[in-house]
From Swiss-Prot:
It comes from Lotus japonicus (Lotus corniculatus var. japonicus). Coiled coil: none annotated. One of its GO terms (biological process) is translation. Part of the 30S ribosomal subunit. Belongs to the universal ribosomal protein uS3 family. Residues 47-118 form the KH type-2 domain. This is Small ribosomal subunit protein uS3c. InterPro entries: KH_dom-like_a/b, KH_dom_type_2, KH_sf_prok-type, Ribosomal_S3_C_sf, Ribosomal_uS3_bac-typ, Ribosomal_uS3_C, Ribosomal_uS3_CS. It is found in: Plastid, Chloroplast. Pfam families: Ribosomal_S3_C. Keywords: Chloroplast, Plastid, Ribonucleoprotein, Ribosomal protein, RNA-binding, rRNA-binding.
Length: 218
């Protein structure tokens, strides 16, 4: 059987860059890794609590972390940054203070910046969130998948593949359903493919959503 490799790790250094940029001694490496996860979780929790959206999409594409001795630079790539900035102009400052408190930073400065993703539905994380929201609202999985593919096609992608696994529609036996539109060349390293794996809790149990988006060839 074919062994499935993570499409992002497979393309690191060619079309894909690292989300965490720092150097550490082997002894401190795990601590730095834990710290990165804590920062990301902290930001996601704050945004979940702060933003109440009808569609249920938070719109976080990815969170990049760059570390220096005295500074931690965090860049949040969002599909809908207005949701965080509108209404309260001081929200980013609030978020910064909140993360700084939880991480107990004394000698290090934390700086958070927000970058807007031009086409939100070209990002697999935002698309997976959209599908998860639809499934939570008991929309038929086929309808949710077709709508997601429609949105990515409008965003100007070359191909998209969506897969949902688990007890779909509450059926007793778990199964895998998938749909593909356009080309998704997973074995071509030059092909710029974005990928996301997302878990959603529904009333029937846990479902796994995977999204592959073929953007272009470099």
């Amino acid at each position: 059987m074919g062994q499935k490799i993570n499409p992002l790790g497979f393309r690191l250094g060619t079309t894909q860059s690292h989300d965490s940029i720092w150097f550490a001694q082997p002894t401190n490496y795990s601590e730095n890794l834990k710290e990165d996860k804590k920062i990301r979780d902290c930001i996601k929790t704050y945004i979940q609590k702060t933003i109440k959206i009808s569609s249920g999409v938070e719109g976080i594409g990815r969170i990049k972390i760059q570390k220096r001795i005295d500074l931690i630079q965090v860049i949040i790539y969002m599909g809908f940054p207005k949701l965080l900035i509108d209404g309260k102009p001081r929200r980013i400052e609030e978020l910064q203070i909140n993360v700084q408190k939880k991480m107990n930073y004394v000698n290090r400065k934390l700086n958070i910046a927000i970058t807007r993703i031009a086409n939100a539905y070209r990002d697999p994380n935002i698309l997976a969130e959209f599908i998860a929201g639809q499934l939570k609202n008991r929309v038929s999985f086929r309808k949710a998948m077709k709508k997601a593919i429609e949105l990515t096609e409008q965003a100007g992608t070359k191909g998209v593949q969506v897969q949902i696994a688990g007890r779909i529609d509450g059926k007793e036996i778990a199964r895998v359903e998938w749909i593909r539109e356009g080309r998704v060349p997973l074995q071509t390293i030059r092909a710029k493919i974005d990928y996301c794996s997302y878990t959603v809790r529904t009333i029937y149990g846990v479902l796994g959503i995977k999204v592959w988006i073929f953007l272009n060839k470099e």
